[in-house]
Amino acid sequence: MRFFKAVILTAAALCGQFLYGQSNNLTLDQATQVALQHNLSVVQADASIGSAQAAVTAAYGGYLPFLSASGSWNRYSTDKAFSTTTNLGGGTFIIPPSKSTINQFGSGLSANLTLFDGFNRQGQVGQATSRSVSAEQTAVRTRQSIVFQTESAYLNILRNNELVKVADENLKRDNKQLERITESARVGASARADVYRQQSIVAADEFALIQAQATYDKSKADLVDLIGLDVGAEYTFNDPSISLEISAGQLDSTASMYGSFKDLEQRSLAARPDYKSAVETYNAAVSGVTSAKSTYFPAVNASAGYSLGTADALSNLSDTKTINWGLRISWTLFDGFATNANVQSAVANRRIAEIGVVQAERDVYAQLKKALLDFEAARKQYEVSQKGVTSATEDRKIAEEKYNLGAGTLLDLLTANAALVQAQVNLVNSVYNYITAKKNVEYSIGERAY
């Protein structure tokens, strides 16, 4: 409860800041908190919990008596317009015209209680309870999924921002090189063809920068849409807690922190809400078989009633009192195989749900295995990309010095520069791949609660 209050207050504070323009920067934690409050998938999942819990209450209501109260008033008016003659005891009597009005009042209270219905109530309660738990687990997994999607989208923004910086630095570097080559060609120290070649490289750099900027802007729009904010508004995304530098100690510690795969399998099965939801779906199907078989048994109901009535004034309502009670036993001996069809359908649903549990278990193992493989690959890629940037930086420096001294060609310099840009891109990608892969492992285990 404290957590949800904190989330609501944080979201309200953020919305207030956006509304009054005090701040439009979102950190990763703020983005996830806003997503948990405004993402429509989360809202829908939470709404389904309320519906499922109401069904549980209704199922338990089957154990309670049904009570009803009634009241009535009827007015009867009789008008005999003509006299009538009747013979009675040997004599003849004339009944003159007459008018009469009778008011009839009544009230009653009745109760009906199911004593036994072939275990149908037990099945209904079991189904409703399991479905309620399944809805809760689905909502938990939905929150985990939205948080992971938000984290991935946020990290993708930071990645694209770094790639924009790489493209911008490369453009500036090539522009400076173009100035040197142009000046060198003006004094006759370089060929005019080198100028044209460098100009084409600068144009390609400008194109790459425009493309990188567009990708960055679109990734921001994707995140804003995901967390449920106004896509038309402008936001910045910066989180000082996310560093591009990953030490060797961090790499080694994270590589060994998860333990063996068997241990992770057990942790995942114990924690994954989607697996728990599949198990509860199976439990609901088992209860469904119980309910379907209930028609094979007799049903026993008890009833009682109390009523008041009068054919006079309402003040005399208690003149006639009636009390009734009794038991009713009913047993369907043959219903055209309808019960058998219902049972077979329920058994089939139970089997389908059982297969769903097995499939959910396989999915947990497969997702966990792939997440660990991606994490290990990202760790190795980061180590390699660091070496690549160091080597490419030195190679480009040497190629530039050779070209300036006339000992190297422009092609050698362009090749070295392209290798440096690619190495920088690889480093940026490897950093964010590593962070994302680590969060994916946590998401695959499913232990984090929100």
Regions found by a protein language model. Name each.
Residues 1-34, 84-90, 213-266, 442-450:
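Terminal intrinsically disordered/low-complexity segments used for targeting and assembly
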Residues 33-116, 229, 265-336, 341, ...:
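A small-residue-enriched
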Residues 43-47, 60-61, 101-103, 115-143, ...:
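Sec/SRP-type N-terminal targeting helices
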Residues 47, 61, 204-231, 387-447:
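Short segments within alpha-helical structural elements
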Residues 129, 192-201, 410-418:
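Short, charged, amphipathic alpha-helical segments
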Residues 145-264, 374, 378:
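Periplasmic alpha-helical coiled-coil/stalk elements that build and connect Gram-negative outer-membrane
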